[in-house]
Amino acid sequence: MMRHVFGMSAEEAKFELRRVLERLGFQVKEMDSEILAEKGSKAVRISLKELGRSELNIPQTEVVFECEEEIYRSILERLRLSRMGG
């Protein structure tokens, strides 16, 4: 289980994560504050929890990944590239 804090709302984080998972070839199912994704024998479960706003008034969302570390790294790498316009 890996934790990460995103500087965005839970809805925005859910949208970005869904987009990345679909690009990685996963079949994605969204629930209220969770994303479940499968690709063959690989599975990903992502839980989102809004933490409020930072001192700079930026929304923060805690994201908990339950998956293989390789998949976790792939997701974060794709997010970094997409958020930087790459």
From Swiss-Prot:
Entry protein name: Uncharacterized protein AF_0576
Highest taxon, organism lineage: Archaea
Organism annotation: Archaeoglobus fulgidus (strain ATCC 49558 / DSM 4304 / JCM 9628 / NBRC 100126 / VC-16)
NCBIfam families: chp_AF_0576
